[in-house]
Amino acid sequence: MTADDWLPVGKVVAVQGLKGELRVNPASDFPERFTEPGSRWLKARGQAPREIELTSGRQLPGKSVFVVRFAGVESRDAAEALVGQTLMVPADDRPELAEGEFHLLDLVGLEARLSADGDAIGTVKDLISGGNDLLVLERPDGRTLMIPFVEAIVPDVHLEQGWLRLTPPPGLLEL
């Protein structure tokens, strides 16, 4: 499988406790990827993804972080070896969406405009997931901006046409 055959859904960011549990920062809007048992894949930098069985998971109350347990990872030492790896699923394992919905990673590559007939003011290069999702926007001059992905600032997404509309507050584009 090539890199395009995989979809990153989270990053292992820390160990939780002494019995092999791990904290995962999600890059997916589908919590079942972290709570429903089944096959997942872990990818270390410079290596191919390797299959691992998710046995359980839960979201920490009031946080966007999940605590997961993988088969065969029974100690803190075993868990620490997985910190920094990316949790993956096959790219064709995307949940069905309702009309008007989209997968956040589909925003990468879209042009950002201030109006439907306006010129592109940048291109979405990445997405940072956390408490609030951020679009990483590359300007034509090479500068990079972080744009909060909230409806007030990104009211329209036109995947089929390859662009999204921004309504930034004063000063956001000058940062």
Swiss-Prot record:
Question: What are the GO cellular component annotations?
Answer: cytoplasm; ribosome
| Primary site of residence | cytoplasm
Query: One Pfam family from the UniProt entry?
Result: RimM
> InterPro entries recorded for this chain?
PRC_barrel-like_sf, PRC_RimM, RimM, RimM_N, RimM_N_sf, Transl_B-barrel_sf
The subcellular location is: Cytoplasm
State the disulfide connectivity.
Answer: none
Among SUPFAM superfamilies, the record links this protein to: PRC-barrel domain (SSF50346), Translation proteins (SSF50447)
Q: Which residues form the PRC barrel domain?
A: 99-172
**Which top-level group of life is the source organism from?**
Bacteria
Q: Which GO terms describe its molecular function?
A: ribosome binding
Q: Name one GO biological process term.
A: ribosomal small subunit biogenesis
Keywords in alphabetical order, please.
Chaperone, Cytoplasm, Ribosome biogenesis, rRNA processing
Q: Establish whether keyword Iron is in the entry.
A: no
**Which PANTHER family does the protein's record reference?**
RIBOSOME MATURATION FACTOR RIMM
Q: What is known of its domains?
A: The PRC barrel domain binds ribosomal protein uS19.
Tell me the subunit arrangement.
Binds ribosomal protein uS19.
Regarding protein family, the annotation reads: Belongs to the RimM family.
Task: Report the protein's function.
Answer: An accessory protein needed during the final step in the assembly of 30S ribosomal subunit, possibly for assembly of the head region. Essential for efficient processing of 16S rRNA. May be needed both before and after RbfA during the maturation of 16S rRNA. It has affinity for free ribosomal 30S subunits but not for 70S ribosomes.
Its name, as the record gives it, is Ribosome maturation factor RimM
Organism taxonomic ancestry: Bacteria, Bacillati, Cyanobacteriota, Cyanophyceae, Synechococcales
